[in-house]
Amino acid sequence: MAPALLLVPAALASFILAFGTGVEFVRFTSLRPLLGGIPESGGPDARQGWLAALQDRSILAPLAWDLGLLLLFVGQHSLMAAERVKAWTSRYFGVLQRSLYVACTALALQLVMRYWEPIPKGPVLWEARAEPWATWVPLLCFVLHVISWLLIFSILLVFDYAELMGLKQVYYHVLGLGEPLALKSPRALRLFSHLRHPVCVELLTVLWVVPTLGTDRLLLAFLLTLYLGLAHGLDQQDLRYLRAQLQRKLHLLSRPQDGEAE
């Protein structure tokens, strides 16, 4: 039992790292653009147009750096999700395979956020500066971001957050209960294999709904939108399963409790 108990601290460390990275990601994608905005460097008049920006090394260099960071994150996230890599990590790390995947993803995302280069002199796709837009647009964006993050946290709980973070696998292993996914129905497993990111719409809202969409933010939003779109493969069978599960849950919630029935 001692070797099994050693797995628990490793899984908890991975979870804490992922949780801290999630908090930092909220700050990076929401609080900084909504409360801090793009760092000023001479005001909007100092920003270049799109054609001029394509010839300016001071803009292209940080843009290429940010692109490299995003490709590093996407590459790690996709490579470790491949079946061959998952089989290899499962062979050598056993029940910690999911925790390892979560920890590596968190570290890759930390690199993106820590070394991200803003481009204050770059062109912007849109910007709310004139009143009343300078007051109401940030407020509307803030409300939509709060709603989106609340929905994201709620959906993660519904989609078995402990299993997604690798905690449930270790817990079941220590208690000798086997693999958690083995207890799920084939239709649920099929859905999970197609729906790698169950919070796609909410993340897209966070990425795109900002008062100022500058060059680096446009790169971040575009590439992550493209990646999220390619990672989804839902079909009609998955949608029918989701509809049936939703109807079943609504039916259970609408049933009167024992005390109320009496």
UniProtKB/Swiss-Prot annotation:
Residues spanning the membrane: 5-28, 59-80, 98-114, 134-164, 192-210, 217-234
Topological domains, Nuclear: 1-4, 81-97, 165-191, 235-262
InterPro entries: Nurim-like
Keywords annotated in UniProt: Membrane, Nucleus, Transmembrane, Transmembrane helix
Membrane topology, record value: Multi-pass membrane protein
Listed GO CC annotations: nuclear envelope; nuclear inner membrane; nuclear membrane
Location in or out of the cell: Nucleus inner membrane
Side Perinuclear space, residues: 29-58, 115-133, 211-216
Similarity section: Belongs to the nurim family.
Protein name: Nurim
Organism expressing this protein natively: Pan troglodytes
Gene (UniProt): NRM
